[in-house]
Amino acid sequence: MEDTSRSKFSDVDEYGFKRAQNFDYKTYEKFMSSYLKTLTKRRMKWEALLRQNTDLTIIDAKLKRYIRKGIPGPYRPDVWMKISGAFKLQQRSPDLYRSLLNGEYEKEISDSILIDLPRTFPDNIFFDTKKEKLYNILIAYAHHNREIGYCQGLNYIAGLLIIVTDDEEKSFWLLKTIVENIVPQYHTKNMANLLRDLAVFKEMIIRRAPAVNRRIENLDSLSKILLGRVYKPNRKSE
């Protein structure tokens, strides 16, 4: 394990995740010493862009290029809300989230979520204080979208949204937008779009990385990997 006492970087990253034991602090410091200048310039460009296009209603080539290069952390919550369409959904039903929290809950759904709370990012140093928010988001969404309800996998999506946005209601609307609009039918019972995308992904590996595909086939692990990812989202917590 590398000694971190001489590094100006913590052994925990900015999101609260512990860095790997073999994390190369020396190389990271060298990289960041120059990359911080890039991040500063990028933030200044985003500031100028947001002054011109506050609502991000104009999704042009420039905005797409900026997004691909990276959205500065402080701007991510609002930018995600606007470019995903979550902000517009929230505006149409501003009281929805609170009304869902004030409604009655099904015990089976609540119990499933409670089982998964301690399993969600247990090594994240910040997450203990966010578990109540995670529960609220998941229980509200499960009762809002009865077709999907609650299934394993949603806790990690919602958990990451909370970590990045630090906003419970924004995380709910982003979760709703992701599950229903951005990757629809990934978490439904038939998982139609997920199965389709996995098939496309497999075909891409075969065509573009045949050596990798042969290695996977030799290990006989592809089916296990795919089946594990496919069936995990809709398994009830045990």
Predicted regions and their residues:
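Classical protein tyrosine phosphatase
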Residues: 153-156, 160, 168-174
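Alpha-helix N-cap/N′ positions at the starts of helices
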Residues: 58, 62, 153, 223-227
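N-terminal transition regions in large eukaryotic proteins
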Residues: 1-142, 162-165
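Alpha-helical cores of eukaryotic small-GTPase signaling modules
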Residues: 98-137, 171-227
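Hydrophobic/aromatic-lined pockets within catalytic cores
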Residues: 84, 88, 139-146, 162-167, ...
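Long, repeat-rich segments with strong aromatic
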Residues: 226-238
